[in-house]
Amino acid sequence: MQQAFRHISRILLGLLTTACFDTLSILPAAAQSCSDDEYYYPYAEREERRPLLTSDTTLFYRAVQGAEDLYGRYTDFALPPVALRRRGLDYTSERNTLSGIGLSYRYFTLLRLLGAEESRFSGLQSGPGMLPGPGGGTLFRFPDGEPLQPYLVSVRFADRNYCFGTRVSGTVRLPGGWRLAAGADFRTGRDLHVEGVFTNAVTAGFRLSRTFDGGDALSLLCIVPVSMQGMRLSTSEEAFALTGDRLYNPAWGFQSGRVRNSRVRREMLPLTVAAWETPLAPSTALHLTLGATAGKNRYSSLGWYDARTPMPDNYRYLPSHTGDRATETAWLSDDPHYTQIDWDELIRQNRMAGGHAVYALEDRVERCWDATLRALFTTEVDRRLTLRYGAEVRLDDRRHYKEMRDLLGADHIVDIDQYLIDDDTYGTLLQNDLRHPDRTIRTGDRFGYDYTLTTRHAQAFFEADYRSDRFLGALWLSLGHSSVNRRGHYEKELFPGSQSYGPSRTLRFVPWTVRATAGWSFTPRHYASLTLLASSRTPEASDLFYQPLYNNRTVGDARAERIFAAEAAYRLTGPRVDFEATLFTVLTLDGMQTRRYYDDMSYVYCDLAVTGIGTWSCGVELAADIRLADRWELTLAASAGRYRYVRDPVVTVLSDVDNTPVDRGSRSRMGGCEVGGAPQLTAAGELSWFGRRGWGVHLSAGYAGRRFVEPMALRRTDRLAGQGGITPEAFAAFTCQERLPDAFTLDGSLFKTFWFSRSRLTVSLLLKNLLGDSDIPYNGYESLRVRRISSGDATYYTPHATRYMYLLPRTFYLTISYRF
């Protein structure tokens, strides 16, 4: 009976609708604007028979399955600005990409100005077609649509790193279907807290794109960052105490009454990315990308030739070493002739040296050429299974050399090894470039060393992404081949012929990655997943050579670093609360590092290699977004973990002048040390209020605890700790790791938005470190040097003081932006 009634109702409804349509079709349509189509009929769309829509149940679960990194988003600006190695991992574990091309942080601001959207991924997660790693990353992409307010102009004022900045951006339509987005970011001024620190930087770029009728898409991106920054150096606690200034910076001094910084970083590293996307079949598309970075990175520092170091905080100039009252009085009185670089004195000594410089300002130059070609195929087998596969090749070519910036009143120097002039054994082997001996170096000339490190990499990859209602399964496989070599452009007299000149032997590696993910959506709001990863990666090229400046000798036990990781995550999304919890563990094996230093035990300049480094990280990350009311929001995030060294690495020390062993195969007592610069306890919270008429307030608090200084493997060997630690106290000084104080900061911001018909104006004030606490160390670094103390016939050893850097006190950012 009910079915018959439904059929009769549908027939009557259909007849009534048809009659209405017939009547309306003969009425005049003065208010209806007809198109040029002679068959135009305003109700034709309503008469079409539409098939009954069938819902895709996988759509209900994809939102909760694809949520972003909540912990990272909530802690980026809420935690104290201390050294933060998330999960105890090195920054190289994090991958930031655009169309598969690796990105540096220096390009992020302009990408956002040009309209790029970014997705954050934590830990073992990654975006589509993005090479996974243990440290997560950021995926940038440009959306297809156009912004509602395509133009931006903003100005900002600050007291940290710079004083004034401005940003402009805009998007326009060009003839032929092209779209152009352009932007620029400018910063200038000195730091109002730390003397000698300044920034003069401009970054400009554009993106030109077009989508063709057949579905093809072409884009060209170019970003050019140019910057000059005065840097800040770490120093010992004694120097901070003597000056009474936690922001003491030993890198600057007065020259003719004006502040001059010896450590200035100058960069110009343009980025170009060209992308072509084309459909090959109804279910397959090709995304071809070519990216390149080319430019120079310069870092200046003072050089001294057969003279005393000009750095004022050198241990020999501190009262603890000199032991005289006059030095202590000079430091306590903040006499800049003692506490800072005395540029006028350096120039005076140069003018007394008969034309040859005793002191000079050098630039350490890195000329980069990094190019990547990537082909990504995407095949949608059906609505549940998507395959991504392809290959990429990369060339990373970096040339390093020194260039004379300022002779400080002198006329020239001779390109010889100044440190060997008084050496009884090697004093006759002084030439830095044997093929051009005794070259006279003047301002702008290249000298000292000149070499190129080249890494070639090729890999193929495959990714399968399967979603079936509640279940998500993903698999990533990649296999590659890498080769690394050095090419010397100078022939060092200490290491003649192929020992320093020409190509070194080529080191080859086979990096690979396997990652598997399984997830289950219990409801459209509850999701849990498990991810496993195993991989090996090529070491940094500079860590494969004992002395890359002028020696082709490679580290003997060079291996690819191995990584094993697991991650279990739970995610809840709801109308009031978003919550995420992640358990993680990461084991890294066969890491390696190389250093160059002066060995106080043997009185020889040495090359150090540390191999077989192993670390283990495990812990939990929690994050929640709670919408308390329509205008109130609370975000919370916390983490707890343990990041430590789990193996005793092998330490090899070679003499820098002849490669004779100083210490070979010694074990370092690193097992049990904590990873430095990685807080093992963090917590952050932010309360936000969004008022009427565009007002808003953010108040946030951050905590970072269980922090440790960066440990050095050398001082924990038998040669140093065993020989130098003749008492329990001395042994502990070499082997125990210092814990840094916990950090707590409070931040606040106030903003007001004025809305107009098609534009808006926003004024915001951000205050960092409201409590003004400047006694919080940013980080600490153990020294490689050892101090010898003689008392009668006995000689005692103690490590050099740890070097620190402290947080800035209360700082502000005032921003005025206009979108239209």
Question: Where are each of the predicted segments found?
Answer:
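C-terminal beta-signal and adjacent terminal beta-strands/loops
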Residues: 32-33, 703-723, 752-820
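A beta-strand signature from Gram-negative outer-membrane beta-barrel systems
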Residues: 106-156, 165
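Transmembrane beta-barrel wall of Gram-negative outer-membrane proteins
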Residues: 157-189, 193-232, 264-283, 478, ...
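Acidic/polar loop-and-plug regions of large Gram-negative outer-membrane beta-barrel proteins
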Residues: 209, 217-275, 298-363, 426-442, ...
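Surface-exposed extracellular loop regions of Gram-negative outer-membrane beta-barrel proteins
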Residues: 235, 431-440, 483-484, 488-495, ...
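Outer-membrane beta-barrel signature, preferentially recognizing the C-terminal barrel domain
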Residues: 249-271, 275, 453, 504-513, ...
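Signature of Gram-negative outer-membrane beta-barrel scaffolds
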Residues: 360, 388-523, 650
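Gram-negative outer-membrane beta-barrel transporters
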Residues: 467-470, 585-587, 606-715, 817-819
